[in-house]
Regions:
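Conserved S-adenosyl-L-methionine
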Residues: 114-218
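Glycine- and charge-rich intrinsically disordered segments
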Residues: 1, 166, 243
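SAM/dcSAM-binding transferase cores
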Residues: 212-243
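Short, solvent-exposed secondary-structure capping/transition elements
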Residues: 46-51, 105, 129-133
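A short N-terminal interaction module
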Residues: 1-98
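Short, charged/polar micro-motifs that form catalytic or ligand-binding hotspots
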Residues: 21-28, 106-111, 139, 143, ...
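Class I SAM-dependent transferase core
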Residues: 91-122, 126
């Protein structure tokens, strides 16, 4: 009697589709372009300030590929979004990136395994926690990578607060930053997919006063659902508005 086939995981499904594309194009270039296209598509549905600039970048990428490959990019997008919607408790893109072996070529880069991030997030949460809704709470990761720690932090807070305080995420802002623009966009995609209210900043955290371009800021959809009164109160007290 033959053993039943093991179901194909979303990570395996993504890698299979990606390998089919990489037979004609370089893997690193394909990955960069996929991440750029997915991040831009998400950003341009909620943040119109940089829409034209990002739209031009998107079309410049599309023009590099034949129609079939462009359709395959859409398949990768669907796999990613479905995987994260069905299981928010994971660093999907970080796992795929590692399994493809792409991170090995980037010196000094290490992505925290999600189970480690999950443990750290749960250990950091107090047994009971009540939000002061007169202000915005901030959760920061100055070296976010693909977003493992922030995703785990969001999930830990949701697990503890959602049943008693359904609108808790209107008062918590998750701020991610990384010197690597690719990592920033991987983090941004995943934050958008699981509904994190936040912003991702591309830049060196050691130089917070450095001038940033508008396109260095990636706002998630849920950022725009933060409570306006709490945002204003936070600005009045700290001089910090939004980020």
């Amino acid at each position: 009697m033959s053993n039943p086939k093991r179901p194909v995981s979303p990570v395996e499904e993504f890698i299979k589709a990606f390998h089919e594309m990489s037979a004609r194009y370089g893997r690193s270039e394909l990955w960069y372009d996929y991440i750029d296209m997915h991040a831009i598509a998400l950003a341009n549905t909620c943040d119109l300030r940089c829409k034209d600039v990002r739209e031009k970048q998107y079309h410049a990428i599309v023009q590099k590929y034949d129609e079939n490959t462009v359709q395959q990019f859409a398949v990768l997008t669907a796999i990613t979004m479905t995987a994260l919607l069905e299981n928010p408790e994971q660093d999907f893109l970080g796992t795929v990136y590692h399994n493809l072996g792409l991170s090995k070529s980037r010196a000094g880069q290490f992505f925290t395994p999600y189970n480690v991030g999950q443990m750290m997030a749960r250990m950091s949460m107090p047994d009971s926690f009540v939000l002061d809704k007169s202000r915005i709470w901030r959760v920061n990761d100055p070296c976010c990578g693909a977003g493992c720690l922030l995703l785990a932090g969001y999930n830990a807070m949701r697990e503890q607060l959602e049943s008693t305080d359904p609108d808790w995420d209107k008062y918590v802002l998750f701020v991610a930053q990384d010197i690597d623009p690719l990592a920033c966009k991987m983090c941004y995609i995943q934050m958008c997919c699981i509904g994190v209210p936040g912003v991702v900043v591309a830049g060196n955290s050691l130089f917070p006063d450095a001038e940033r371009a508008p396109t260095d800021f990636w706002f998630t959809h849920k950022y725009f659902a933060l409570d306006e009164k709490a945002l204003e109160n936070t600005y009045q007290k700290t001089g910090i508005y939004g980020i």
